[in-house]
């Protein structure tokens, strides 16, 4: 079934892959592209010349964050940087894309792309958990990263993102960390679980 999709691009070196995703999406769907100013630095001039890439309020009349939030069936942030995820989780609206996200009340897909150390940082993980009630996180994968590194943080491939959009997966709940069972008002049985295994399971399920 054809969809109206708003593709959001942020300032990651992996943003060049968004051009391939746009090509896949545009074959049978209506697609509009919003980008942050940083995102523009990582997509080709050819792509920008062939497509309308909206990044500034000055490019559109009226209230585009309202109009496009109501127009789109889905918003896909591909790729999403640590900075963008953190701003979104904290309700910041300092650009057109973030303002539109905060207006949107349907399914949002976010594909993180960053170094493993950033992705596993407690603050980033907390932001992802906070957003997970309303956002479907897609990836990242383990693989090649910037400056020749390898790790968990590689953006999922365009075809994977496309398949997720059109072959929706079921939701699951993963619990982790220490548990407590009260014996009476004073005594309790607990454990020293770190929650690392549960987090690893959750990350694998998100990918």
Q: How would you name each of these model-derived features?
A:
Residues 1-207:
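A cross-family phosphate/adenosyl-ligand binding-site feature
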